[in-house]
Amino acid sequence: MIWKDYFVSIAEQVKEKSKDIKTKIGAVIVGKDNEILSTGYNSFPRGLNDNVVQRQERPEKYFWFEHAERNAIYNAARIGVSLKQSTVYLTSGLPCMDCARGLVQSGVIKIVCKKHCTTKNSGKWKESQERSLILLNECGVEVEFY
């Protein structure tokens, strides 16, 4: 099994921890020696009551859920792990603009993601993802689609 397939399969497992009833996204951030530095999935912030049904419904959920990519960044920061020169493997398409900026600023140099947005509400993210690709290209972050 090649590394890409290995880490994507781990991200697929990580996403299953999400309590989002409609969309599950996973992220695995890996160092230059193929060591796992951090993982993340879309979720409510730590300590927030995740049993409030209204927080699961669109558009309300967009105020409450954190994205997998940013959760992986925050998880690394909480334990003092540098993400400099790392690669992130996603179970989704391109990250949104907010996540793309976070990945760039945290030192990620490569993103491996699906060619197309796979969320049920992909239209909401199209414009953000188009801009994030421009940002990633200008900032020298390699994008590999699978």
Q: What residue spans do the PLM features occupy?
A:
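Zinc-dependent deaminase catalytic domain
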Residues: 1-146
